[in-house]
Amino acid sequence: MFKPDFKSRLLYFVLFVDIYGIFTNNIDKIVYKKVDCFKINIFIF
């Protein structure tokens, strides 16, 4: 089974959060979303 490494997986999460923040114009919440995504990645792996 192919499993992407932690760094590439985290990078996709960060990019998704940045795009989501731009489209929703929630600039203040982007940092908190990144922290949440980082915690999610830790729990996934």
From Swiss-Prot:
GO terms for cellular component: membrane. Its main location: membrane. The chain crosses the membrane at residues 10-27. It is found in: Membrane. Keywords: Membrane, Transmembrane, Transmembrane helix. It is a single-pass membrane protein. This is Putative uncharacterized transmembrane protein DDB_G0281023.
